[in-house]
C-alpha cells in the first residue's frame, strides 16, 4: 500500500511539498476551508473546498455537516449552512446543490431565467454555468470535487467525481462541453482537484477496476495488488489524467493531494468512518450583480437539500 504523506505542516503553513501545488488553508469566522492558488488568481471568482470544521453538528457529523440526508438533525444542518452563508456573505438562497447520482449528466445553467422546477430535475453530477451570484456546490466525503474555470470567458464548472462518474470520464465530458458549447480555449481552462480519498486508502475489487481498463494512461492511476483480485485506485489521479488527455496544460491544474480517509480530523470520509458520516461542501461562484430572481420550487430549502 502507498503511504499518505504527512500534510499537517504544509496545510497550516502554506509550504508545498516539493513538486506539488499546495492548497491554502483559510479560516473565515468559524469556517475552515482550502483555496486553490491557481483559482485564487481569478478575481471574479469565490471558491472554497470546505473542511468538516466550524459547525455545530455532533458525533459522527461533527461539525460542519451540510447534508440533510445522512441522519443528522435538520436544525443543525441548517445552522451549518447559515454559518457558511454568513462567512462568505452569500445569501442562503444563492447556494445550489444537485442530487449527485453517480452518473455523468451535466446540468447547464443559463445566465438568466429559470432552470429547475422540482428536485428530480437536479439529478446530475456536474454543473456548468456563467450565471453570476449563484454558488454551485458539490457534497463530498471521499469522492473527488473537481473545479473548472474558463478564466477569459468567466465560465465555471463543478464536478462530483466518485469512482462511477470517474469511470464514465465525467471530467473529460465537462471539458468537451466547455470547448464545444462555449468555445473555451484549452489554454484558458483552469482545473482544481480538491481533497478526496487517496490511493493510500482506496483498494477496489476487479469489477471496479474493470471500469477503468479502457481509459488511456490508466497505468498512472490503477495499480494491481499482485496475486489477488484487488487493485489500488487513485481517483484524483484518474481525473487529472482525463484533464491532461484533453490537452489542458499541466501548469493549469492544481491538486490538493489530501486524503480524506487519512485526515478525518479535517474531512468527512465515507470509507474511513465505515459509512456513517457527514458531507463537506465545495463550491464556486462568479461574482457580480445577481440576475432577476426566479422562484422555481415551493420546498422550504430547495436549493441545498
Predicted regions and their residues:
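Active-site microenvironment for binding and transforming phosphate-containing groups
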Residues: 4-305
Amino acid at each position: 500500500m502507498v503511504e499518505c504523506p504527512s500534510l499537517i505542516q504544509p496545510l497550516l503553513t502554506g509550504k508545498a511539498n516539493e513538486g506539488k501545488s499546495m492548497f491554502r488553508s483559510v479560516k473565515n469566522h468559524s469556517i475552515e476551508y482550502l483555496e486553490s492558488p491557481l483559482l485564487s488568481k481569478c478575481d471574479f471568482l469565490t471558491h472554497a473546498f470546505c473542511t468538516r470544521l466550524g459547525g455545530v453538528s455532533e458525533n459522527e457529523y461533527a461539525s460542519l455537516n451540510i447534508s440533510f440526508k445522512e441522519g443528522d438533525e435538520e436544525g443543525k444542518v441548517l445552522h451549518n449552512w447559515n454559518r457558511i452563508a454568513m462567512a462568505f456573505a452569500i445569501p442562503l438562497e444563492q447556494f445550489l446543490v444537485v442530487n449527485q447520482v453517480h452518473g455523468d449528466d451535466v446540468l447547464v445553467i443559463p445566465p438568466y431565467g429559470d432552470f429547475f422546477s422540482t428536485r428530480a430535475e437536479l439529478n446530475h453530477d456536474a454543473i456548468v454555468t456563467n450565471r453570476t451570484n449563484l454558488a454551485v456546490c458539490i457534497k463530498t466525503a471521499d469522492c473527488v470535487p473537481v473545479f473548472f474555470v474558463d478564466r477569459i470567458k468567466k465560465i465555471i464548472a463543478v464536478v462530483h467525481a466518485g469512482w462511477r462518474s470517474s469511470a464514465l470520464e465525467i471530467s473529460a465530458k465537462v471539458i468537451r462541453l466547455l470547448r464545444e458549447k462555449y468555445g473555451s480555449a484549452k489554454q484558458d481552462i483552469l482545473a482544481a482537484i480538491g481533497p478526496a480519498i487517496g490511493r493510500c486508502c482506496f483498494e477496489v475489487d476487479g469489477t471496479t477496476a474493470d471500469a477503468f481498463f479502457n481509459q488511456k494512461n490508466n497505468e498512472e492511476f490503477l495499480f494491481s495488488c499482485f496475486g489477488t483480485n484487488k487493485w489500488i485506485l487513485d481517483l484524483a489521479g484518474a481525473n487529472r489524467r482525463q484533464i491532461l488527455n484533453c490537452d489542458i496544460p499541466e501548469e493549469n491544474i492544481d491538486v490538493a493531494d489530501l486524503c480524506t480517509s487519512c485526515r478525518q480530523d479535517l474531512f468527512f470520509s465515507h470509507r474511513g468512518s465505515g459509512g456513517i458520516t457527514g458531507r463537506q461542501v465545495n463550491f464556486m461562484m462568479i461574482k457580480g450583480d445577481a440576475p432577476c430572481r426566479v422562484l422555481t420550487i415551493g420546498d422550504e430549502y430547495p436549493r441545498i437539500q
